[in-house]
Amino acid sequence: MNKQQAELLNGIALAYIGDAIYEVFVREYLLDKGLTKPAMLQKNATKFVSAKAQAKIISAMDEVDFLTEYELTYFKRGRNAHSKTTAKNTDVVTYRISTGFEAVVGILHLTQQKERLQEFWDFSLKTIEADLV
């Protein structure tokens, strides 16, 4: 997929791929930390991938103006997208913010912005790492 095609995707599609990419970052990180027991992997992964965690990261990013205008456009596209899925363990606002978070990961991945995606991951890691067991 080229950049133009990626930029035309709706927020839900961007969040769909962004969710998968972010999950891989988290799983690799946890394995690199030496976690191998499924219960510990799941417990710690949730601290990164839950809607509440992603909303916390976005809030921290907002405090320091981390997101570029380009990224904010795709965050809003994801956040404002009308999804047929409902929030499971959180409120609708938090769920929508997390969808925006995943949309940013999706657009960065699909447009091959690897360095910026790494910066996004590093910021996310720094924000959540203190909560790990």
Curated annotation (Swiss-Prot):
One of its GO terms (molecular function) is rRNA binding. Pfam families: Ribonuclease_3 (PF00636). One of its GO terms (cellular component) is cytoplasm. Keywords: Cytoplasm, Endonuclease, Hydrolase, Magnesium, Nuclease, Ribosome biogenesis, RNA-binding, rRNA processing, rRNA-binding. It is found in: Cytoplasm. Homodimer. Belongs to the MrnC RNase family. This is Mini-ribonuclease 3. It comes from Lactococcus lactis subsp. lactis (strain IL1403) (Streptococcus lactis).
